Amino acid sequence: MDIRRASDRLETKISWLDSKHSFSFGEHYDPHNTHHGLLLVNNDDIVLPGAGFETHPHRDMEIVTWVLQGSLVHQDSEGNSGVIYPGLAQRMSAGTGILHSEKNDSWRLSGERHSDPVRFIQMWVTPDDSGIDPGYQQLEIDHELLRGGLVTVASGMPRHRDQTAITIAQKNAALHAARIAAGNSVELPAAPFLHLFVARGAVTIEAAGELTEGDAVRLTDTGALRVTATTDAEILVWEMHTRLGG
């Protein structure tokens, strides 16, 4: 069990962006902190209104974006576009190569101007195979989250094939999310590798103690642990059944 506090994260901060990295990213490199299981990136990004990431390339990566506040506009070279907001998950398969941009929407869904930043978590996992076709999918799951349990957001695992979830091209990984009311609990799946990130609030985990916003725990070969919210909380959990290099 490896607990990583919010203050331990690497950070990129410029005029329009505050990005906190759970793993090595960009100019920040730590050879002892490159991934956990199949997860290479878990970035906690805050982007100011009217700003964002201009068109840039990706290749051979499954990228899942989860918005916590505000709205984010996506456009890519495959002709896909969409506005992502809390409760709507997005997956982009980079495959043989894709160009895309991500920007703070600068508009509320009502069409009114606003001055709010957008905060989102972007997560990258490796695909089963390189050189697949680029792809895009988004899915509204806000209703499922209201139930308070662990919801499968994205998965390539055969057992989730019949569930309402975004598909990813990685048969050994699944992303789950939960919005947990204070005092309530969820049970984590048992897996060789788990990564739990506290996106909001605070939780306690069996054998790990309390985690607060921005904290994470990396679990290896643990059973099904119980997570209890000490305040209203939102968590993101990667379940992985192998690691990079097998």
Language model segments and positions:
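Jelly-roll (double-stranded beta-helix
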Residues: 1-246
